[in-house]
Amino acid sequence: IFNKEDQNELLNKHFAKSININTIDISENFIKKYPNFIKKTLTDLIQATKYFKYKEVEIKDKLYYIFYNVIFETNKNLLQKCLKRLSFVAIGTIADNMPIINENRIILKVGLKEIALRERMSINYLLKDANILTKPNITSTDIAYKIAPILNSTGRLEKADIAINFLLTNDINQIENKFKEIKEINELRKYKEEKAWNSHNKNTIFKNDKFIVCYDNNTPKGISSRIATRLSSYYQKVAIFLTKQDNIIKGSIRSNNKINSKTLISIIPSHLVINSGGHKAAAGFTLHENLLEDFIKELEYATTKVEYETTNENESIPIDAILPKNLTKDSLFKTIEIFEPYGYEFREPILLMKNV
């Protein structure tokens, strides 16, 4: 907060002192550097900021701008510390399948350069295991297919702390021991995933020409999204995979670009769903086990109401560029590298060379 006395008074007034609130006052160091702002409120800072005079900005964005600049103005070395950790952020961005647009592109690009410096022993260990330690440039594709899956396996089996401890340590013995654990967890993940896949036919509870729904109460919830993705790809349908933990059912939707997954869940009455979230391509939700039968009925109804995109066989392929015949392979690769990193919502270019 900024200006603790005033802000705490407002918080106590709002919550009627019903809860204990601990705050950190970021104004103290700022005022030492800029004494003219003593006794100033956040409103005063917003009014004094010229940036807001030339564009319409929502109040939440104004507050973010103020707090961001106050923190970095009084902690000049903080940004450098953050930059040294962007290798982790880059891996996390890809591993969590975040859209590679806007700020994410900048963070990922800088993070990949940080990885290429080979300064993190744990990350180097991952690169070595993937046979890319000596590769000059590490790409988003390298992370997506060779690094992210093995790290993600720990979270899928609810043992993410092992991956965190592995990444953060600089002790070579701990790195070796933790990585051995991670490899074992990944093998277990593969086994459980294959077991769930092999039994999906008997666990299919609803299927038509557009949708398939499976319920397997023995599959770990962290694997449900993987099975949903495989189902969607294999059947070329919208896939929904359900699993159970402690009387709570967790569902994963993969749309195969046929529907808006988030819209599908929104059609189902809210009293049947505990939590839900996602985007067009994928969504997740939870519900109580005793409501499963009602949920399936409503889900079947929702599949008839959600807008479904059919594939047009004559649909044209969007071409990003037409290549000249005299373009060398090295020039082509260099051009493609310029637009790195690629990933979700920022695909590799589709190129055309005529009359080859």
Segments and roles (model prediction):
Residues 4, 10-11, 42-82, 91, ...:
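Acidic, Mg2+-coordinating catalytic module of metal-dependent nucleases/exonucleases
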Residues 10-14, 212, 227-230, 331, ...:
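A short acidic, amphipathic alpha-helical/loop segment
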Residues 63, 152, 336:
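A residue-level signal for conserved active-site and pocket-lining positions in enzyme catalytic cores
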Residues 97, 305-356:
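A contiguous loop/helix-start segment that scaffolds small-molecule binding in enzyme catalytic cores
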Residues 35-45, 229, 332-334:
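Short, surface-exposed amphipathic charged segments that create phosphate/polyanion-binding patches used
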Residues 75-297, 308, 318, 322-325:
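Hydrophobic helix-and-loop "lid/oligomerization" segment in the mid-to-C-terminal part
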Residues 35-39, 57-60, 64, 105-108, ...:
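Amphipathic alpha-helical transducer elements in NTP-driven molecular machines
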Residues 1-35, 56, 60-67:
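Conserved DEDDh/DEDDy metal-dependent 3′-5′ exonuclease domain
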